[in-house]
Amino acid sequence: MTTKIFKPDNCNEDQLKMFYDIVVEGKQVNPNGLLNRIKDADYLSFCELNNEIVGVASIKNPDKNYKKDIFKKANVEKFADNFDYEIGYAVTKETHRRKGISEQLIKSLMDKSTSKSFYATTKNDSMRHLLEKIGFAKLGDNYTNDNNEILTLYRYNGKK
């Protein structure tokens, strides 16, 4: 299993499309405008196993208004400016789940970044567990997104 990290500007169109396709396949993110959001990320991480990309994750550069809205929905708006980056788009192909791939991707991204002020949001119970295992802690209240899904906001608490 090999993890590779790139700046989006250093990815070719095939890599960006592969990243996009895996994220859409995971059904955790609205695909509208997704490719542009991927290109705006700080870093993209790919996990390769037997010459196949089996998982992806990113350090996102969140839009300031988007970030404020999330923190407001979680009733912790005053903390929004404390976080530079969002960990996101962490998806492992279904046939390769439960092998530690998302954990490896997220940890490698966080190690690569000079910042340690991360937050993440999720509606997925497995990702909630993984974020807590890595050292994230719940921040604020659960909130409902535009699709009536319940999300949890997490902040990075330091390495465990």
Residue ranges and their predicted role:
Residues 111-124:
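Conserved GNAT acetyl-CoA-binding A-motif
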Residues 35-36, 42, 46-93, 97, ...:
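Conserved acyl-donor/pantetheine-binding loop and adjacent beta-alpha core of acyl/acetyltransferases
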Residues 30-33, 72-75, 104-108:
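A generic local structural motif
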Residues 48-52, 60, 122-125, 157-160:
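Short, flexible beta-strand-to-coil junctions
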